[in-house]
Amino acid sequence: MKFTLSWLKDHLETDASLDEICDKLTAIGLEVGHVDDRSSLKGFVIAKVLKAMKHPDADKLQILLVDTGSGTPVQVICGAPNARVGLVGVLALPGTYVPGLDVTLSVGKIRGVESFGMMCSQAELELSNEHDGIIELPEDAPIGGLFATYAGLDDPVIDLSLTPNRSDCTGVHGIARDLAAAGIGRLRKLSLPKFVSSFETPLRVFLDFSQDASLCLGFAWREVRNIQNGVSPQWMQQRLSAIGLRPMNALVDMSNYISFDVGRPLHVFDADKIKGDLRVRRGREGEQLQALNGKIYNLSVKDCVIADEEGVVSIAGIMGGERTSCDEMTRRVIIESALWDARSIAQTGRALGLVSDARYRFERGVDPAFMETGLEVATELVLRLCGGEGSKTKIVGYQQPEIKQIAFPFSEIKRLTHLEIEREQVITILTNLGFGIEGEGNVVTVKVPTWRPDIAGKADLVEEVMRIYGLDKIEPIPLEGFAEAKGQVLTCTQIRSRVTRLALVDRGMREAVTWSFISESQAIAFGGGQAQLKLVNPIAADMSVMRPSLLPGLLIAAQRNADRGFPDLALFEVSNIYEDDTPEKQQSVAGGIRRGTERFEGAGRFWDGHTRTVDVFEAKADALAVLEACGLDIDKVQIEVGAPDWYHPGRSGVMKLGSKIIVGFFGVLHPAILERLDVSGPLCGFEIFLDRIPESKKKATKSRSPLKLSPFQMVRRDFAFVVDKVITSSLIVRAASGADKKLIHSVRVFDVFEDLSLGEDKKSVAIEVAIQPIERTLTDGDIEALASKVVENVTKATGAYLRR
């Protein structure tokens, strides 16, 4: 929100300096983003060229004698092609700082001829990039006068960074109101004209809505005829130019000016270009509008528009159309002042990519009680600038806004701020801000002004009082000290999340944080997409459903890195997934993926040439590392087939505890899933459900039991079993381990062999059993007895026989 200092003083009677005003604005919550005081232009004067002579030693230079109003001509050397006798321009005298050159002028010689100043271009004054010639001013410009004053460039421009809730400060009058309440001057009341009109406009306006009446809560219009649309006055042009708007003509400039002056967006139609009646309605598929910015916009049924019998003439509340725009030939206009739905304006603006000052104000909310008054202000300004006569005002669809009332106990200020503020001071602050106060005692009724839609409750009123009283007066209060917590502070899930992160980082993986919402197609591919998990207002079309798995986000992140030259990587995330919208179905999960050659041992090419890509075993090892870090005995984990469809059916597994508890999945990602997500492999991944891991029954302790190592040598024996192909290796390992849990240290598969010589649908699985004596060295008989027990257990569990 930009405005000039003189503009502010039209609404605020004050002697405060620019610095005092800016400091107070920031203090009351209206942050000053930038101030352009343009003090660097104060030393430039208006001068007229009296004489122009060719430089004796330079073909492209001239010796100018210029009149500065002092009575004594000044000699200046100039190389501008447009320098000539009679030209009125801008002169910088010695001692003047030239911002475009970043130099301070002094008397100097150019090719042997002294120069006592410099005729300036727009680029040298940083007014534009134009540097081909010096500035040319009208002949009636005051010779010797200050250029900054003449051009209106001595008026500081203040730029506020408004928060979205302060719609009341999108006009200079609202800003002045806040400053007056804060003690910076006195608020000047708006001059609200009233007209006695002699005729009625024949134009009719219809609100063509069925159940969408909230799209337009009121539409007021008035016709003004017999006007002359010329240029706007210089003071208005200077103010509009200062805030970055290009002056066009009196009618356009008037509507822009009122939008910034009192925060009331308007639109002016050329009445002779309107065909028939106006209708406010939804857009229609295939409709287009060439807007005032020259661009053509394709409209839809989601857009609110104003249309006549020939089609759309305006995108409601955002921008008008070229067909009904006003020009120098306009003689009859319709001034429109309406109330548009903030949400509809915001949605249409985003969909069309159309930004305007009107949209900026309507999507934040304008004062509903100022709709007709704003029309009166606009009419008065049109009559003053363009002449003519106005019709009676017509209004459709408007109802007086209901005044919001809040029961406000003065004790609420002490409760929220720990400050004691006098009752009368609180009432004065709220009254100066436009609030109405009724009642006596410690609880009063506060009537919220219609221009403050952001005030909803008692806390908002406390905030209003405090930002005017002074937020800096709130003394810091140290946090209350608490005794040291006894017992476990972190929850089980928090502890598991922490140790999981450490374990996966130790395995060379990098943590990622991805969005909790993904596209509907991705969610369906990973078993989700339920209706109750769809977002009502997604931030993007491809982020519309809560994720059922961590893998989609990690896969997209991996592909994004691969596209940027990092194909080998390992990512993990510890976060939540969602099965439905109940708290019980929000699960804490650790998920990870590896891509390319990013194995635990490293990535990329090796000197021996044996570069291997990631496979199911990397994913399995990562998953087991998580389970082990969470305190689970991984020897109890059963690995079976039957992973979800997004895994490769022959290169994946399910991790179970017993027959029912599934604690995770791992494997190579299915090629069809990768193609569906437009992701390239090789890729493997895992998912561990942290909430499903049983809590350890061991009592937590900071001390560790001493390491006990056996002094006896470990014995290893190999066994090769012939089993059916459907038998998993994990079943054989568990059966062998159960032969003697005290002596058997580990069981490991080291070979799988398939051949017709073994029989149809048969395979050979070779295991190594490590036997660790504890109390004494085992005899051959002990070892043979244990070996027989191993064979017996495996045969009983799987139907295998020992391969000879």
Swiss-Prot record:
Domain FDX-ACB: 710-803
InterPro entries: aa-tRNA-synth_II/BPL/LPL (IPR045864), B3/B4_tRNA-bd (IPR005146), DNA-bd_dom_put_sf (IPR009061), Fdx_antiC-bd (IPR005121), Fdx_antiC-bd_sf (IPR036690), NA-bd_OB-fold (IPR012340), Phe-tRNA-ligase_IIc_bsu (IPR045060), Phe-tRNA-ligase_IIc_bsu_bact (IPR004532)
Gene Ontology biological process terms from the UniProt entry: phenylalanyl-tRNA aminoacylation
UniProt-annotated location(s): Cytoplasm
GO molecular function: ATP binding; magnesium ion binding; phenylalanine-tRNA ligase activity; tRNA binding
Domain of life: Bacteria
Leading EC class: ligase
GO cellular component: phenylalanine-tRNA ligase complex
Keywords carried by this UniProt record: Aminoacyl-tRNA synthetase, ATP-binding, Cytoplasm, Ligase, Magnesium, Metal-binding, Nucleotide-binding, Protein biosynthesis, RNA-binding, tRNA-binding
Necessary cofactors: Mg(2+)
Binding site for Mg(2+): D454, D460, E463, E464
PROSITE patterns for the chain: B5 (PS51483), FDX_ACB (PS51447), TRBD (PS50886)
Enzyme Commission number(s) of this protein: 6.1.1.20
Cofactor binding note of this UniProt entry: Binds 2 magnesium ions per tetramer.
Domain tRNA-binding, chain residue ranges per copy: 38-148
SUPFAM superfamilies: Anticodon-binding domain of PheRS, Class II aaRS and biotin synthetases, Nucleic acid-binding proteins, PheT/TilS domain, Putative DNA-binding domain
Quaternary context: Tetramer of two alpha and two beta subunits.
NCBIfam families: pheT_bact, YtpR
Family indicated by similarity: Belongs to the phenylalanyl-tRNA synthetase beta subunit family. Type 1 subfamily.
Protein name in the entry: Phenylalanine--tRNA ligase beta subunit
Species of the source: Bartonella quintana (strain Toulouse)
Lineage: Bacteria, Pseudomonadati, Pseudomonadota, Alphaproteobacteria, Hyphomicrobiales
